[in-house]
């Protein structure tokens, strides 16, 4: 029965290897509780997945996007600007922030917006670095 189903699907997904990937992904989704779009007829999940693809009740393009999304392990984040990164990597930024805080608390010079943003960023980055170091220690056994 599965051979006939595979033959029915080849015109919807021309590459048999991709067809197997998509049907396998759909079968795992069914096992996890996804709703069926065709009658089960006492068939196993991979056969039902192939029948769904053959009947076009599930679109291969949608399955492909779901499969790609499930395989991605992390989301790309924006890279910090090179200039800011260089400031953070050098010891100058930390010294400037301390001087600026001291001046602001003493009632002397006012802190510029740029200095305030650097100070906030250094405060944000510091706890993240400590928690990342703690995570690295937990992972080592």
Swiss-Prot record:
<keyword id="KW-0804">Transcription</keyword>
<keyword id="KW-0240">DNA-directed RNA polymerase</keyword>
<dbReference type="GO" id="GO:0000428">
    <property type="term" value="C:DNA-directed RNA polymerase complex"/>
</dbReference>
<feature type="region of interest" description="Disordered">
    <location>
        <begin position="121"/>
        <end position="141"/>
    </location>
</feature>
<keyword id="KW-0548">Nucleotidyltransferase</keyword>
<feature type="compositionally biased region" description="Polar residues">
    <location>
        <begin position="121"/>
        <end position="131"/>
    </location>
</feature>
<dbReference type="InterPro" id="IPR036161">
    <property type="entry name" value="RPB6/omega-like_sf"/>
</dbReference>
<keyword id="KW-0808">Transferase</keyword>
<comment type="subunit">
    <text>The RNAP catalytic core consists of 2 alpha, 1 beta, 1 beta' and 1 omega subunit. When a sigma factor is associated with the core the holoenzyme is formed, which can initiate transcription.</text>
</comment>
<dbReference type="InterPro" id="IPR006110">
    <property type="entry name" value="Pol_omega/Rpo6/RPB6"/>
</dbReference>
<protein>
    <recommendedName>
        <fullName>DNA-directed RNA polymerase subunit omega</fullName>
        <ecNumber>2.7.7.6</ecNumber>
    </recommendedName>
</protein>
<dbReference type="GO" id="GO:0006351">
    <property type="term" value="P:DNA-templated transcription"/>
</dbReference>
<dbReference type="Pfam" id="PF01192">
    <property type="entry name" value="RNA_pol_Rpb6"/>
</dbReference>
<dbReference type="GO" id="GO:0003899">
    <property type="term" value="F:DNA-directed RNA polymerase activity"/>
</dbReference>
<dbReference type="GO" id="GO:0003677">
    <property type="term" value="F:DNA binding"/>
</dbReference>
<dbReference type="InterPro" id="IPR003716">
    <property type="entry name" value="DNA-dir_RNA_pol_omega"/>
</dbReference>
<comment type="function">
    <text>Promotes RNA polymerase assembly. Latches the N- and C-terminal regions of the beta' subunit thereby facilitating its interaction with the beta and alpha subunits.</text>
</comment>
<comment type="similarity">
    <text>Belongs to the RNA polymerase subunit omega family.</text>
</comment>
